[in-house]
Every structure is written in structure tokens, then in C-alpha cells.
Amino acid sequence: MGVTRNRFYIWFLFVVFFVTDLVFCRTLSGDPDPCDSTKQREFQKLRSDQVTVIINGYSEYRIPLLQTIVASYSSSSIVSSILVLWGNPSTPDQLLDQLYQNLIQYSPGSASISLIQQSSSSLNARFLPRSSVDTRAVLICDDDVEIDRRSLEFAFSVWKSNPDRLVGTFVRSHGFDLQGKEWIYTVHPDKYSIVLTKFMMMKQDYLFEYSCKGGAEMEEMRMIVDRMRNCEDILMNFVAADRLRAGPIMVGAERVRDWGDARNVEEQVVDERVRDAGLSSRRVEHRKRRGKCIREFHRVMGKMPLMYSYGKVVNSVGEQGLCRKAGKLVFCDRD
């Protein structure tokens, strides 16, 4: 009788802990009141040696890629935890259950992993403060960008030296069209003012600034993001630049692959639906919409806080001289 009771007790504990862990990590839609200032931890008390990775997920076609990306991040010792924010409300529960199990099973590192089913598809949700985040730095990234571990760790080292700046590997710029007399979204060859959320590292404070401060003005700009279904990254750059009066920092990466870039040709993409799932795959319309966002944010704020930065921080410059080897011009230090 005692043995049977003990077996039942062990089985009960297994079920409770297994199911509790699964439900918590898969159904949690965020803190009930993310803007409760009493729950905000003091910056100095947060961990400075690691970063929390927050990945935005939506497309079911990208789930295999998402699993690979999570596994890659989890393998780095600087990653404290990984939060996958799932914003597609139509995804079946069974598929999300399987996704969560795969994330746990195939991620080799010690980082804790949570799959958080969002209550809405609002892009603003990726910047909500979360009480579970215990690091000073957070990395906001997409589900279609792979970056190597050394580049991740280098970006973190750059951020630690510049904790008030936005740091990233993908950049764009604002500009003023003299002919049209309006602000536009563009790319400049020698300067930039916007870091994209493909890979954006920042201090946790900016989540609270974006989601909870700024009064009616900030609320109106978040509504613009919802209406356009775009531009949350541009608005975060507005927030950081307005507070800091400085532009972002671009860092170089040894190997980074953007599977959602529309310039991927079909032969290079395992499934073209992986490439086409993103909003930004429709390039011309995408750029026009983002230009409109910049103009709308400028209208609401009554000023243009975005500031230009120049150059890129790289891990090493290496050999710059070219030599002819095997009939090809290559850097001289290459075999």
C-alpha cells in the first residue's frame, strides 16, 4: 500500500510540474499590468553579464527556422533566457504545444526558454516590459535572422560599452526629400539613424519608455504602429534618440543570414514561403509605408529626434592588402 501511494505521489508530482511548466510557458500572455512601476527592477540590480533574447514569431512556415535560431541563441553562455513571443492568434494549440516541446528538446544551452502566446498580434507587444527579464540588456530580434555566436557576443560587448545606445547589425536611415518636401525612409551609403528589430540590442529601460511613458503623445504613436501594422522599430529609435540625443551603433557580424530578405532567390531559400512570410518582403510598398510612419511620428512629436551615426564597429579589421593566389585576388593573409 505504501509503495503504491509513493508511486502515485511521484506520478502526481511529475504531472503537476510538467503541465505547470508547459502551461506557464505557452499560455502566458504577459504581466497583467506591465506598466506597474512598482514591479520595475532597479537597473543596477539587474544582471550585467548576460542578455535576454526576445524573438517575435508569427508565421507557421517559419517554425523549423525558429527552432534552429532558438537553439543557436541558447548555445551562447551570455544568453540568460529566451522569450518567444507568438503573435499569430489562429495557430492551433496542438502546434504550439509541439513547438514548445521542440524548443526545449533541441536547444543545447542552459538558457531558460518560454513560449508566450500573445493576446493580440500588435507589434507593440514585443516592447512590453516583462517582470521575468532579469538582465540589463535585451535583444529584440526576428524569427528569420540567423547570426553566429561570436557576432552575438561581440555585439553584447559593444552594447556594454554603450548601454544607452541601440546596437544592431541591420540599419536604415531617415531623409528629407527636397522635391516632395517630406520625410522619407531610405538607405544612405555613409550614415544611418535607424536600427532594425531584425537584431536590436538595448537596455531594458527602453521597454518601459516605449510602452508606459510619453502620455497621450506616445499612445497616439503606438496606435499608428497598430494601424500601419509596421514601424515599431522606427518608433523605438525615435524614443531612444529623443532621450539620448544620439544615434544608434551598427556592429559588424562575421556571419548573419536574413531569410526574410526579398533579395533571396528561390534557389537559396528552402521554402519560398519562409522568405515571403514577412511584411518587409514587399519592398517598394514597405518602404513607402515606413516613410509614412516617419512623417506621422514627426507630426505627433512636432520634431525630428532621429540622429545620424557614421561607420560600423567591427571585431577586427584583418589584412587589407590584396595578393594574387591561385589566379585570384584575395586578402594576403588568407591561405
Regions found by a protein language model. Name each.
Residues G87, D134, C141-D143:
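Active-site acidic Asp-centered loop
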Residues T68-S81:
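Short, acidic, metal-binding catalytic loop of nucleotide-sugar glycosyltransferases
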Residues I55, I78-Q94, I116:
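Short beta-strand/loop segment that forms part of the nucleotide-sugar
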Residues Q118, F127-A137:
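Active-site nucleotide-sugar/metal-binding loop of Leloir-type enzymes
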Residues R130, C141, V145-V225, R229, ...:
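Conserved catalytic core of nucleotide-sugar-dependent glycosyltransferases
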Residues G2-S37, Q44-T52, Y61-A71, K213-D335:
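C-terminal catalytic/acceptor-binding lobe
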Residues Y61-P64, P89-L99, F176-D177:
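Short, charged/polar "capping" segments at the starts of alpha-helices
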Residues Q105-S121:
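Conserved donor nucleotide-binding strand/loop of the catalytic core
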